[in-house]
Amino acid sequence: MMGMEIRRKHFPDTIRFHNPGLRRHRTSEISCHQIEEFVSISLTGTHCALDCKHCGTNVLRGMNDLSRSSKSLFELCSELAEQGARGILISGGSDRKGKVPILPHLPDLIRIRRELGLIIRVHPGLPDEETSAGLAELDIDGAMVDII
């Protein structure tokens, strides 16, 4: 079976892209949403060990900073859901290996999925096998990757 036939057998013909709300866009293909509906959360605040030129931690500055909060990720998301949020993007700065520290937050993410029903998208950087397995168990709605 050829590659395109395999893809068509297992996936629809549409691709859904996520515009995380850090910049406002409106085109015929992209509709704006209220920023409060889909909230971006940085697990590391503005800290990133890589500080790459394409970002320079600027993207992290527009996110809710979990690292400065006394709340758990679940508590923060509970409040956001009460305020009308329908989904979250979990991101943050990378460590020296390019990994965003999502693994310690997987128990909260599982609770968020089960108890709050929020859409969960992640920007994991370059996740290790354990993080990847946890995200698969969580059944995330999408993953964001850097294309440089």
Q: Model-derived features: where do they sit?
A:
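Core AdoMet radical
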Residues: 57-76, 80-148
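N-terminal [4Fe-4S]-dependent radical SAM core
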Residues: 1-49, 53, 57-64
